[in-house]
């Protein structure tokens, strides 16, 4: 079930997202403080995929999360992550589709994102949704790691 991050206790969302970040992204993971700052930053939208109707329980389980920043013309995807046990079940696609719909409702003319060139599953997902490559930022993550910049067709 996809919900706005505000529908579950903030400490729960922050803690679970930070734990997922650490597992998924290692040294590049967002800390709890970074997640909390993103939640409170202006013009941000964050969505969570939670297990079942867990929003009604005391301990909802966050399976995946995604967010974007909208500046009045473009929306930029800040992050998408899905816990390893829940990957390859369509959660990332559902989150991405919901982000795109939300950004368009706000008036975004296009959606931008950046992704590591070696993140093959993410690249396939974005291409399936019609995102195209705009460029390459060399050594963005580390000296040997590059990142592609994509945008959704208008």
What residues fall within each predicted segment?
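Conserved beta-strand segments that form the floor/walls of ligand-binding pockets within enzyme
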Residues: 76, 81, 112-114, 135, ...
């Amino acid at each position: 079930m996809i919900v706005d991050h505000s529908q579950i206790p903030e400490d729960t969302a922050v803690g679970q997202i930070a734990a997922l970040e650490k597992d998924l992204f290692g040294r590049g993971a967002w800390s709890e403080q970074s997640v909390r700052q993103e939640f409170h930053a202006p013009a941000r939208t964050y969505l969570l995929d939670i297990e079942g109707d867990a929003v009604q329980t005391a301990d909802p389980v966050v399976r995946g999360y995604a967010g974007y920043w909208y500046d009045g013309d473009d929306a930029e995807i800040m992050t998408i992550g899905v816990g390893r046990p829940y990957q390859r079940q369509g959660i990332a696609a559902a989150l991405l589709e919901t982000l795109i719909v939300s950004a368009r409702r706000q008036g975004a003319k296009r959606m931008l994102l950046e992704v590591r060139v070696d993140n093959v599953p993410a690249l396939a997902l974005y291409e399936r949704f019609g995102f195209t490559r705009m460029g390459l930022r060399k050594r963005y993550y580390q000296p040997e790691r590059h990142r592609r910049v994509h945008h959704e067709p208008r």
